[in-house]
């Protein structure tokens, strides 16, 4: 293990399960022997406000906050929330974006326009390192839209081949009620597969 600290930013909208996803990551990376620090910033999370988690891991991490322009990995649960943090990403950043639009109140009130073709904008700057996943759609096919966050975690896990699937599934087992284990194992597998297609 070298001294490098890796920075992951998770961004989403309240109710999408972004915080649970960051807890899954924390569980996995601690189990893999890393020091982990994370910091959550909630807008009006319960009302569909933004939710952002700064997540850092390495041999020794001193601060949970990621500097502007220093994100190695972005996991975005909603298109506009991805766009909001595009400038936080390093030039070599790797990105997973959920292909879902949740219109903020300002758009609904006609005060702002929702940006067009957000995935295209990301591809222009991070060519070949942007993976757009239909997390919501895939979770619905499995029978529960709430599993979209685990679909995205499954896709995101592809960036860390050194961490075996068993570790990710162990985190799901420890953090989720038993009655939804099987659903979430399937959601994880589907996300992992969708990333590779």
Where are these regions (language model features)?
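Active-site cofactor/cluster-binding pocket
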Residues: 1-197
């Amino acid at each position: 293990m070298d001294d490098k600290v890796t920075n992951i930013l998770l961004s989403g909208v309240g109710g999408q399960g972004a915080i649970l996803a960051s807890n899954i990551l924390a569980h996995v990376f601690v189990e893999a022997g890393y020091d982990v620090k994370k910091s959550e910033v909630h807008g009006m999370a319960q009302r569909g406000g933004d939710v952002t988690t700064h997540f850092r891991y390495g041999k020794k991490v001193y601060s949970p906050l990621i500097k502007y322009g220093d994100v190695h990995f972005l996991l975005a649960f909603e298109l506009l929330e991805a766009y909001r943090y595009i400038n936080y990403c390093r030039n070599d950043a790797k990105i997973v974006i959920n292909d879902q639009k949740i219109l903020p109140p300002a758009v609904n009130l006609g005060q702002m326009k929702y940006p067009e073709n957000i995935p295209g904008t990301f591809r222009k700057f991070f060519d070949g390192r942007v993976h757009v996943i239909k997390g919501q759609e895939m979770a619905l096919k499995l029978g529960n839209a709430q599993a979209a966050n685990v679909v995205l975690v499954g896709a995101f896990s592809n960036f860390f081949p050194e961490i075996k699937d068993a570790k990710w599934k162990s985190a799901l087992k420890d953090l989720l009620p038993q009655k939804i284990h099987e659903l979430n194992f399937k959601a994880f597998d589907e996300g992992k597969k969708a990333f590779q297609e």
